[in-house]
């Protein structure tokens, strides 16, 4: 996400768990378009309401304390939080059954947590955010698209379930957009 945003003129603050993340960012992004900080995502080194928009993709399901991560994202956002998660109401229902097959296809698959829309909405509401908007990305499991490595074919595969409304009902991962209530100042709660 950082590359297209920086190409559109955005100046970014990127965090990661290791210095190598900053090295990777520097290899892909124009100099002067970002700052990088190695830090603990469960205790971000930024002030409350530090950023108008906070993005977090492909991380939430891999963190043991997902509620702590979401709390921190909400804390440092003054307006919008965007993130994604794997929804339990999808092909992920077969996650435990098919994990070994998925791992054999992808090689680097890690275990992950599945969430419901209700869990996500409840967590966001607790941190002063309006009910979120949910955008399911894919009907077919992401492993299928990664294995194909053909964006055009993936779009063709995804079109019928999208037209039929199946992606809206059963798609995953889900991109979430939540907007902070302007009248609700940040309440830190437990840290």
PLM regions with names:
Residues 58-59:
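Short catalytic micro-motifs in class I SAM-dependent methyltransferases
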Residues 79-107, 111:
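Conserved class I S-adenosyl-L-methionine
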Residues 133-191:
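A C-terminal cap/extension of S-adenosyl-L-methionine-dependent methyltransferases
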């Amino acid at each position: 996400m950082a590359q297209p945003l920086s190409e559109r003129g955005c100046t970014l603050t990127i965090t990661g768990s290791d210095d190598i993340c900053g090295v990777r960012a520097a290899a892909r992004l124009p100099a002067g378009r970002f700052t990088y900080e190695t830090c603990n995502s469960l205790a971000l080194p930024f002030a409350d309401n530090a950023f108008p928009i906070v993005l977090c993709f492909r991380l939430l399901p891999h963190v043991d304390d997902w509620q702590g991560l979401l709390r921190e994202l909400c804390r440092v956002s003054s307006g919008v939080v965007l993130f994604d998660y794997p929804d339990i109401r999808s092909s992920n229902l077969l996650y435990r059954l098919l994990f070994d097959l998925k791992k054999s296809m992808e090689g680097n698959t890690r275990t992950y947590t599945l969430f419901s829309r209700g869990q996500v909405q409840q967590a966001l509401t607790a941190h002063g955010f309006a009910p979120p908007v949910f955008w399911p990305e894919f009907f077919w499991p992401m492993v299928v698209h990664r294995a194909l490595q053909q964006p055009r074919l993936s779009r063709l595969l995804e079109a019928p379930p999208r037209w039929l409304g199946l992606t809206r009902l059963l798609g995953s991962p889900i991109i979430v957009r939540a907007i902070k209530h302007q009248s609700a100042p940040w309440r830190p709660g437990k840290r």
